[in-house]
């Protein structure tokens, strides 16, 4: 890790260094949480295991298949579209930088160290970031946050007291719909009150008409 940072800050002279420093600031340990603006935190994402997140290639293919038109559009669609664009560009800059550093390191061991560090540490953070942006756009804020909280509660509960399977994000919208239907039952019980109001409305109209006639 120290070798990689040393190559970036001191020895590296490629033109993408400054851009990479800016876009990778939070990856280098700065106190920047890219999820706070959207109601989540790095700690909340950390409850999800590393093997939960798809590969960067699969996430990029998913983003392209679902939101390519919006991502390539010059117009501002939403803060999450902008954040997704930045994450994709950030990964591209990181790959360019890692390739440059790897090609300029003569020691094979140092080269492997750079590649492994990028794939394990920085790659995981990019996978988390891409997954969060895509899930937010696909399922919505409330569903994603509810899933993160539900998974966090599940993973921290002892195995003897929790369900065998972890929560699934794609099933939460169905649960949300059921809850909304349950909440919608209360107005149905109050249906007599509108009927009474309707029955009273003609009387009021008649009284008003009599007063107008007078």
Curated annotation (Swiss-Prot):
Residues 186-214 form a propeptide. The keyword Lipid biosynthesis does not apply. The record marks 185-186 as: Cleavage. It comes from the Viruses. It is found in: Secreted; Host nucleus. One of its GO terms (cellular component) is host cell cytoplasm. Its main location: secreted. Residues 165-214 are annotated as: Disordered. Pfam families: Hep_core_N, Hepatitis_core. InterPro entries: Hepatitis_B_virus_capsid_N (IPR013195), Hepatitis_core (IPR002006), Viral_capsid_core_dom_sf_HBV (IPR036459). Residues 25-27 are annotated as: HBEAG. Phosphorylated. Keywords: Disulfide bond, Host nucleus, Host-virus interaction, Repeat, Secreted, Signal, Viral immunoevasion. Transmembrane segments: none annotated. Homodimerizes. Belongs to the orthohepadnavirus precore antigen family. This is External core antigen. The lineage of its organism: Viruses, Riboviria, Pararnavirae, Artverviricota, Revtraviricetes.
